[in-house]
Amino acid sequence: MKLYIIGAGPGDPDLITVKGLKLLQQADVVLYADSLVSQDLIAKSKPGAEVLKTAGMHLEEMVGTMLDRMREGKMVVRVHTGDPAMYGAIMEQMVLLKREGVDIEIVPGVTSVFAAAAAAEAELTIPDLTQTVILTRAEGRTPVPEFEKLTDLAKHKCTIALFLSATLTKKVMKEFINAGWSEDTPVVVVYKATWPDEKIVRTTVKDLDDAMRTNGIRKQAMILAGWALDPHIHDKDYRSKLYDKTFTHGFRKGVKSE
């Protein structure tokens, strides 16, 4: 038995990978997170495929359904939003499935952090400014490990991408400030990146909570923070070594500067 776990991408049905789409179109049974995955994408399933929504299922119910269908000899795919590796809760599914002898293939997808960066026309790693991106979430009802508190992570002063934190912006602001961030540090909030009702909000650490409330954003938002998100970054002249004419690498010999 084999299960395919497919990353659907951030929203736009055209952003699923070619491989993911092929598997979706071949599957006899499609289980998908209906609260987050585009119906337009799922509509590309093959005619006659059994399509099951999982938002209302608990773990054992979902895994049991997949096992039942695979034991009937059917090709089953599990479609997750974004990339399954990021907050996809796939490990708990895999543990139960592997106990039953199921082989698993994971097909990666475009995660919302990079869709949000694209929407904001941002590069998250700017030479001489920041070369690090931290992907994390604020601590809410679900705790984070002791050494992963946002205040501690933010002390690196790099670009930070916050998943699952739209209702925790007051806490986010406090932890950024406690980490030594200035109140005018740029923040970009992208609501439903790549969906038709996508919204981009540019703000600062100081005004983050007000901006979220003003725009009515309470879920499905990616928060990008740090000076790489400076709205005036395009007026500056940060340059990488990669395309510097004096820089030598395996595909090009640099020339001496005059």
From Swiss-Prot:
Coiled coil: none annotated. It catalyses: Co-precorrin-4 + S-adenosyl-L-methionine = Co-precorrin-5A + S-adenosyl-L-homocysteine + H(+). Pathway: Cofactor biosynthesis; adenosylcobalamin biosynthesis; cob(II)yrinate a,c-diamide from sirohydrochlorin (anaerobic route): step 4/10. GO terms for biological process: cobalamin biosynthetic process; methylation. PROSITE patterns: SUMT_1. The keyword Protein transport does not apply. Its EC number is 2.1.1.271. Keywords: Cobalamin biosynthesis, Methyltransferase, S-adenosyl-L-methionine, Transferase. InterPro entries: 4pyrrol_Mease (IPR000878), 4pyrrol_Methylase_sf (IPR035996), 4pyrrole_Mease_sub1 (IPR014777), 4pyrrole_Mease_sub2 (IPR014776), Cbl_synth_CobM/CibF (IPR006362), Siro_Cobalamin_biosynth (IPR050161), Uropor_MeTrfase_CS (IPR003043). GO terms for molecular function: precorrin-4 C11-methyltransferase activity. It comes from the Bacteria. It is an enzyme of class 2 (transferase). Belongs to the precorrin methyltransferase family. PANTHER family: COBALT-PRECORRIN-4 C(11)-METHYLTRANSFERASE, SIROHEME SYNTHASE-RELATED. Homodimer. This is Cobalt-precorrin-4 C(11)-methyltransferase. It comes from Priestia megaterium.
